[in-house]
Amino acid sequence: NLRKKTELIEQMSAADITFISDSTTLAKGITATLKAKVDADLKNNKYTLSENLLSVNAVKARLNGWVQLAGDDINTDITLDCSGNNFKDILSLVPAFYTKDFANLTASGDVSLTAWVRGRMTKTAYPAFALDLKVANGSFKYADLPKSVTDIALRASVRNAGGSLDATTVEIPRFGASFGGQTFSATASVATPMSDLAFKASANGKINLGAIKEIYPLDKDMSLNGIITADVSAAGRMSQIEKQ
């Protein structure tokens, strides 16, 4: 007979993970590992995370909380402690940065990343979840390129009160950066992503495409030219675009 309580030691890893939704690649090339000690209450099917470390590319997080099996459902209350990560770690989550040139990238800035999942998952409903990311005074530079990107600021959040994934909202009330004497800022928000995506976005600034090669390592056969000047805003639903 199994003891009512025991300790489990888990170690899992996966490489080159790709996330695809409706034929759209959301992320690729992700490497993830999890090392964890789990206190298992076998009588109540409750598993509490104790010592653990989750790594996703260069980002490291500690998981606090528990998971409980309830028939076909799963109850959960988990928070992610992401303290200790720096701006370069966060950039590793962006496929365009997490390449062979990542080792040549230096970055600095103030970063805050928090996330949690709480509630019951069933065959038809999801628990509530949230993620908040803040970046201030950010900058990055590749060692073999002449210029850097500075004054990076970002506030972003993902929210869902539980139930349907269609209740998920994404808010980016602030994004800004400067490079080559130019500044660019933008905002965005997304709602009802599963049924009829509703969006609102704005952008302001000037981007010299010819200067991109001075801040980012382009492929040898890629050449960018031209100047983009933006002072625009847009709002609508995906169904409206599909009708055009």
What residue ranges belong to the model's regions?
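Membrane-proximal interfacial segments on either side of biological membranes
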Residues: N1-T48, V59-E171, Q182-Q244
